[in-house]
């Protein structure tokens, strides 16, 4: 099952306690303190693995605990540090923290998943392969009694306990990274278009809501240029209110630099102009920033439309919107070369460089 939204409870390891010990060797029956420090608790770390495509591996393991540090030992020996817990996530994950003022200790402390629209505290974002984010930092090890010796107290009989590791409950939200995002009504031919132009193989069928999860494919041009495209489940009017399936996946086109509106020209009951404005309206209700993205419009299924009808639809669309659509047939591969060249030209002229990010982000404070 495709999963792009999960809740986890993470807890870093506790630092090991310091040791109370005194040197007892031959010829030194009353040696001084030699208790070692405790080891540091393990961190909980998120790391991007480009081979992963969703977050389903967290569904049955929402509780993630790093190893505790070991206590110190005599002869000034430091306890072993706890092992870090590395959690792999796909590129494009956004990390939110729930109730940062609360300390979590067990699964009984789990909070309910917030409803869509509730404000969340964003603490990190993982985009590039290999990027790491310290979700919870392990506690420091306690000092052994050797650290407390002084001229006044040469035989301290006390030590420090290790610090508790950081803990928290987090939401991981996947936003697919794709250069181009396809938007359209159910059964408009988005999946067929994706199959035609990329290496992706989404399911296609002559009924609505065939696409139940986002699909990403790569367009390979003859000169070696590559461009990624994403197809999400179709939108319907009222999608911003939770109707249909598309609303839950609109996050997957937020990072796209170019949007492609796919219109079905073959359906006699659909007005292409009205469909276009419906799609724009749903994007605006979800996130106004999506309307600022550059876009192309394609009129699909022209193989099922008579030439005079296609010409009329094209002129009418231009007259009422001031815009034009590219006529294509995703099924018959008509107009695909022009479509891809237009996508590439628009993408190259409008894409923004993603700022470089450090490989390891700062831990929670």
Curated annotation (Swiss-Prot):
Binding site for Mg(2+): 191, 211
Required co-factors: Mg(2+)
GO MF terms, alphabetically ordered: GTP binding; GTPase activity; magnesium ion binding
GO biological process: ribosome biogenesis
Record PROSITE patterns: G_OBG, GTP1_OBG, OBG
Compartment list: Cytoplasm
Residue intervals of the Obg domain: 1-177
Domain of life of the organism encoding this protein: Bacteria
Keyword terms of this UniProt record: Cytoplasm, GTP-binding, Hydrolase, Magnesium, Metal-binding, Nucleotide-binding
Residue sites binding GTP per the record: 184-191, 209-213, 231-234, 300-303, 329-331
Annotated SUPFAM superfamilies: Obg GTP-binding protein N-terminal domain, P-loop containing nucleoside triphosphate hydrolases
Enzyme Commission no: 3.6.5.-
GO cellular component labels: cytoplasm
All residue ranges annotated as the OBG-type G domain in the record: 178-348
Function: An essential GTPase which binds GTP, GDP and possibly (p)ppGpp with moderate affinity, with high nucleotide exchange rates and a fairly low GTP hydrolysis rate. Plays a role in control of the cell cycle, stress response, ribosome biogenesis and in those bacteria that undergo differentiation, in morphogenesis control.
Family (UniProt): Belongs to the TRAFAC class OBG-HflX-like GTPase superfamily. OBG GTPase family.
Quaternary organization: Monomer.
Protein name according to UniProt: GTPase Obg
Gene name for this UniProt entry: obg
